[in-house]
Regions:
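Acidic (Asp/Glu)-rich catalytic clusters
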Residues: 152-157, 194
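Conserved strand-turn element in the central/C-terminal portion of the radical SAM core barrel
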Residues: 188-213, 217, 232-238, 246-256, ...
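Short, electropositive alpha-helical surface patch
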Residues: 121-123, 211-227, 285-304
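Alpha-helix-loop-beta-strand connector modules within alpha/beta enzyme cores
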Residues: 121-130, 184-200, 258-269
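N-terminal [4Fe-4S]-dependent radical SAM core
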Residues: 1-99, 104, 130-132
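Canonical radical SAM enzyme core domain
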Residues: 72-77, 115-119, 125-152, 205-216
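Core AdoMet radical
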Residues: 44, 65-81, 85-88, 97-114, ...
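Auxiliary Fe-S-binding modules of radical SAM enzymes
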Residues: 1-20, 34, 92, 97-99, ...
């Protein structure tokens, strides 16, 4: 567990993320997905149940809003990332500097024609060269992988396919307007393997309010042996079929605490299967949450929350396995992880003290001169034998 804590901390927290998130503006490759908000008035009007424009706005006004919502220029993100990279590199000059291992391309790049896809990939590949990143991971819908050749993507720098499964449970897929099933997903996984590319998975958590059903999705994910796991929250946007269901009372959303508890179980299950590259994205349509949000849990610091919970579980088990009752203990660790160990407002330590009837838990910074303590995530629990008043 200690090793997995170190790895998830490096992958999810310390490491900066280069994420290029293309908005999804069409149902192409996503069938008739209930959670999609589509930037295509003509296409939308041909799909049953989607022709009503909200708030009685005129078509011209609606198109104007949609257009502004979906504007995305990859060069803007590249410029921002380059500036961040150069500034941080300058600050850490002379040190062992490493920014990230991978670039993530998420969302709707696959909805463009091939020429546009390759043009966008060329820009990102050039950026990757400048910042010294060798791995580029591209998210693709299941139907895209099944219907198109993906081998050519390797020529454009893509080494990993993030398969946008949405879910791995047939019932969840069916209820959300997707025509493919788990059988088709396994075919897509096999096709990626035949292309000699790494395979990762992205999925939306919370499409079902049945926790057992959600956890079965993760069990199936483990069987597919993904390199990475991209987890998105089920955020309901205005103008979607799920929005109609929610308004009518036919869609139940998980509470904040239910979401956190389920995510904790999902992360724990993933770590046990040695899936340590876990990326959290707010929504499949993250670009337009601000303007079109209706309901759903949105976290600004879910990575930190999950790592904090992982440390609590580790410390809890560590003390339990010591089989020594003591009212005072000392936790030695690098100062950089003190916050994760303590939890928000010392919540982790307070719970430990209450459960084990302790009076005091001291936090001591690990001696950096100790060669065995080079890892920034080193953690040691010491039983204090001295008597205290």
């Amino acid at each position: 567990m200690k090793k997995t804590l170190r790895r998830i901390l490096q992958n999810s927290i310390d490491e900066k993320k280069y994420i290029f998130n293309y908005p999804i503006t069409t149902f192409k490759y996503y069938d008739d997905a209930n959670f999609l908000f589509v930037d295509n008035i003509e296409e939308k009007s041909t799909i049953e149940g989607k022709q009503d424009l909200e708030n009685n706005e005129s078509n011209d006004k609606k198109e104007e809003i949609l257009k502004s919502s979906f504007e995305y220029n990859v060069e803007d993100d590249i410029e921002k990332y380059l500036e961040d990279y150069n500034n941080e590199k300058e600050e850490k000059e002379g040190k062992n500097y490493k920014y990230t291992n991978k670039i993530y391309i998420l969302g709707g790049l696959a909805q463009k024609d091939k020429k546009e896809i390759y043009t966008e990939l060329a820009k990102i590949k050039e950026f990757a060269k400048k910042v010294g990143v060798k791995d580029i991971a591209l998210e693709l819908p299941v139907n895209y992988v099944l219907e198109n050749s993906i081998r050519d993507l390797k020529k454009h720098g893509v080494k990993e396919i993030i398969l946008a499964t949405v879910s791995l449970e047939d019932e969840i897929l069916e209820n959300n307007g997707l025509s493919y099933r788990y059988k088709e997903i396994t075919k897509a996984v096999f096709k990626i393997a035949l292309s000699f590319m790494k395979m990762s998975l992205s999925m939306i958590i919370g499409l079902s309010n049945d926790e057992k059903e959600e956890l079965r999705v993760v069990e199936k994910a483990k069987e597919l042996k993904p390199k990475s796991l991209v987890i998105m929250q089920n955020v309901v946007l205005k103008g979607t079929e799920n929005a109609k269901k929610f308004v009518r009372g036919n869609l139940k959303m998980l509470s904040v605490e239910e979401n956190k508890n389920m995510l904790e179980k999902i992360v724990t299950m993933a770590l046990e299967k040695k899936i340590t590259d876990i990326l959290f994205v707010r929504s499949i349509q993250e670009n337009i949450i601000k303007d079109k949000y209706l309901t759903g849990v949105i976290y600004s610091n879910i990575e930190e929350e999950m790592v904090t919970r992982m440390y609590y579980n580790y410390i809890f088990e560590k003390i339990k396995n010591l089989k020594v009752k003591n009212e005072y203990i000392t936790i030695k660790a690098n100062k950089e992880i003190f916050g994760y160990i303590k939890g928000r407002d010392n919540s982790n330590l307070d719970k430990i003290k209450e459960l084990y009837y302790m009076k005091e838990i001291n936090m001591v910074e690990e001696n950096k001169k100790n060669k065995k303590s080079n890892s920034k995530n080193n953690l040691e629990i010491v039983i204090a034998n001295d008597e205290r008043e």
